[in-house]
Amino acid sequence: MNAGSDPVVIVSAARTIIGSFNGALAAVPVQDLGSTVIKEVLKRATVAPEDVSEVIFGHVLAAGCGQNPVRQASVGAGIPYSVPAWSCQMICGSGLKAVCLAVQSIGIGDSSIVVAGGMENMSKAPHLAYLRTGVKIGEMPLTDSILCDGLTDAFHNCHMGITAENVAKKWQVSREDQDKVAVLSQNRTENAQKAGHFDKEIVPVLVSTRKGLIEVKTDEFPRHGSNIEAMSKLKPYFLTDGTGTVTPANASGINDGAAAVVLMKKSEADKRGLTPLARIVSWSQVGVEPSIMGIGPIPAIKQAVTKAGWSLEDVDIFEINEAFAAVSAAIVKELGLNPEKVNIEGGAIALGHPLGASGCRILVTLLHTLERMGRSRGVAALCIGGGMGIAMCVQRE
């Protein structure tokens, strides 16, 4: 795609906090997380719910959530029954793919205003048992839907952590290099939290507790005070034969959260007196060998930047999802990026990685960082389980 004379723009962007596994958001149904951000982005954009053409959200772990959880989130946010709502599933890239689909829908004239984003409550993902034909005798094993549907490669039957180990070996990313990336992510996020840099992008979530409703408004996954000495003591988790380098500390987390943006054409924003956060310049998606899925952002970023008519040097800020430190280091190394331009507020290693929400979460953070720093050009990108990558170029005027 190309921006054209009347580009698609983002007029508001927000996210919930990112909750730890079985943490602050664990009891909040995923559709309620979605409703929370949908309400907020519409409020910020001063768009009436009935003016929305369509709602598109990424969502991965849908088992047991009821019929069309995104439709539930849409209606729960006050959007009328007459407005369609649906989900897309591209594992880690789902939340950004939803934004791409919104851009396409608006671009061809099918929609005028779209709410796009992603949501996930990994804490509520169920264990599954196949009992349709009954169990004649013996035990019935349970399948963890997080592992089965989210974190296990279907082609090589291996955990995503093994694909990170494969990238580390092929791109010669040492354990020390990975731990340095992880500590930097934690330290940057700690600094950003203390400086209030995330405050504007976060919408508080009301959580029911024994003491009544409480307002949750601070990301709870980051570990303040992280240092290389403590991190280097952790043992590799996925390969335990002495060759492993990926640990729980240099990998992203299992998390809960939601994020959303409101999109429309520039002419529609002008008519409504809205100042866009950015315009969508280009986007790209690619496929790669699944066993090294983490390198997906490399060709995706190259393609998106080329479509935009930019060079990598033209980009002010990159938000590249930190699924694993090994992957982040390999991407920066292969593309020759300036580390000072990449994930400057920290990334998923510190903040967390709620699968279906992460694609839009990094876009929301990118938009607010560009605004706060007065920068113009940004790229959001993610690697995707199953061997894919997705990237988007945005520009502030």
From Swiss-Prot:
Which InterPro entries is this protein grouped with?
A: Thiolase, Thiolase-like, Thiolase_AS, Thiolase_C, Thiolase_CS, Thiolase_N
What molecular function terms (GO) are annotated for this protein?
acetyl-CoA C-acetyltransferase activity
Give residue numbers for the site Increases nucleophilicity of active site Cys. H353
Q: List keywords of the entry alphabetically.
A: Acetylation, Acyltransferase, Cytoplasm, Transferase
For the modification N6-acetyllysine, the affected residues are: K200, K233, K235
Q: In which pathway does it act?
A: Lipid metabolism; fatty acid metabolism
- Location relative to the cell: Cytoplasm, Cytosol
Gene Ontology terms: cellular component: cytoplasm; cytosol; extracellular exosome
Q: Which residues form the active site?
A: C92 (acyl-thioester intermediate), C383 (proton donor/acceptor)
Highest taxon above the source species: Eukaryota
| One BP annotation, GO | lipid metabolic process
Its main localization is cytoplasm
Q: Does the keyword Acyltransferase apply?
A: yes
Chain positions found as N-acetylmethionine: M1
Disulfide pairs? Answer: none
Q: Which is an annotated Pfam family here?
A: Thiolase_N
The keyword Cytoplasm belongs to this UniProt entry's keyword annotation:
yes
Q: Describe its function.
A: Involved in the biosynthetic pathway of cholesterol.
Q: What family does the entry list?
A: Belongs to the thiolase-like superfamily. Thiolase family.
Self-association state and partner proteins as the record states? Homotetramer.
Q: Which PANTHER family match?
A: ACETYL-COA ACETYLTRANSFERASE, CYTOSOLIC, ACETYL-COA C-ACYLTRANSFERASE
Question: What is the name of this protein?
Answer: Acetyl-CoA acetyltransferase, cytosolic
Q: Which organism is it from?
A: Homo sapiens
Taxonomic lineage from the root: Eukaryota, Metazoa, Chordata, Craniata, Vertebrata
